[in-house]
């Protein structure tokens, strides 16, 4: 199983003599670094960056890890003028969506056609296309009363809730409150003390 990072583009925008100058990143500034025998990291360096520079970048991830979608933080430590998170998931994978934070995101949720590769075979099916967009988001700042300010930023989290393939029973990966209650009460270290 692998993830492929592709279509990396980056630009630096600077004001020079009253005009906006856009500098495109060249392919030679994209680096791959092998971390170990299983992992490789992709890095890139945006040219002509200095104080006041606006940076724009985009990339695409194609992943075999159907059970995990990376969380997305719309807010950063610096103000974000525009940010977008665009994902498509085959209809058989049921993800629970959790959005939180104080900033408003534009959200699109539509059905599209996708190709799903399983065991080398390509299947055509419907997919759920989700797109989240944020505009003019303020930067996150440290606060004396907040342990981890990033936890309070506007973000999107997706968790695999279940699999629903045709001809198979639905397989759930999430717990209901009743399941959690039962597990806690059955636990000898926790529930046993409540059954006095």
Named regions from a protein language model:
Residues 1-84, 176-178, 186-187, 191-193:
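Lumenal/extracellular ectodomains and adaptor appendage modules
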Residues 62-67, 71, 75-196:
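Secretory-pathway-linked proteins and extracytosolic
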């Amino acid at each position: 199983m692998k993830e492929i990072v592709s279509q990396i583009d980056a630009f630096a925008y600077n004001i020079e003599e009253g005009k906006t100058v856009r500098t495109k990143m060249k392919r030679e500034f994209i680096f791959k670094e092998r971390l170990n025998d299983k992992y490789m990291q992709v890095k890139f360096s945006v040219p002509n960056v200095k104080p006041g520079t606006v940076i724009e970048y985009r990339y695409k991830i194609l992943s075999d890890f159907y059970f995990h979608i990376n969380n997305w933080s719309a807010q950063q430590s610096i103000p974000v003028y525009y940010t977008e998170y665009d994902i498509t998931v085959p209809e058989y994978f049921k993800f629970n969506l959790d959005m939180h934070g104080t900033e408003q995101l534009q959200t699109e949720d539509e059905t599209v056609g996708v190709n799903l590769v399983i065991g080398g075979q390509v299947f055509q099916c419907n997919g759920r296309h989700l797109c989240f967009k944020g505009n003019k988001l303020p930067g996150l700042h440290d606060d004396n009363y907040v342990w981890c300010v990033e936890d309070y930023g506007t973000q999107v989290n997706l968790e695999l809730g279940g699999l629903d393939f045709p001809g198979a029973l639905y397989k759930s990966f999430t717990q209901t409150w009743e399941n959690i209650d039962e597990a806690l009460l059955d636990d000898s270290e926790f529930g046993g003390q409540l059954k006095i």
